[in-house]
Each structure stands twice: as structure tokens, then as C-alpha cells.
């Protein structure tokens, strides 16, 4: 059963390894609702979808954390992902769909722009 869901449009810095080699999604409000405010680690299943259907699948890990956890007044949440074949195909403007099920498994689905 799905217990949380977030949807966002991917930015250049989130997916372009030439723009940033950080492997992170920005921690938007909908992700904070799913993962909370504490550092957490998750197993994840990744998929890349286009008009052709699911083109790539993979498994990996995610880390939810506050990149400014040592700053007393500012927060900057990030969802770090390890290298994953489906994410290598992602582009700025694609849609990111993240769900978490009742067992704590996180599904990361990239949907190609225009699909």
C-alpha cells in the first residue's frame, strides 16, 4: 500500500552530471511530507518510462538529509541517490514520481517529458 507520494519536475542540476555531480533531488515540500525532518536511509527501486513504456529499471539506495543540519536557522533538504541506470537517462523537464509503500520501500519513477 502506498503511504506517500511526491511529484516534481526535474531541474538541470538534479540530473545533469556536467552541471552537478551531487546525485541529489531538491527536498521539496511534498518530499518532506513523506520522509519527515530526520536523516533516513531507504532501499529504492528505480524506473525510467517513456512513450515506449518502461525502458530501464534498477535498484539502489536513497538518503534523506538536511544539507545544512549544522546551521542553526536554515534547512536545505536533499534526497541523495546512488548511481542508477534509469537516472542516467533522465533529463531536465522530466517528471519525477516518488512513492513510499507501507514497508518503507521507495519507488523512484522518471517519466520522460512529453510522455
Label the model's feature ranges.
Residues 1-115:
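Intrinsically disordered, charged low-complexity linkers and terminal tails
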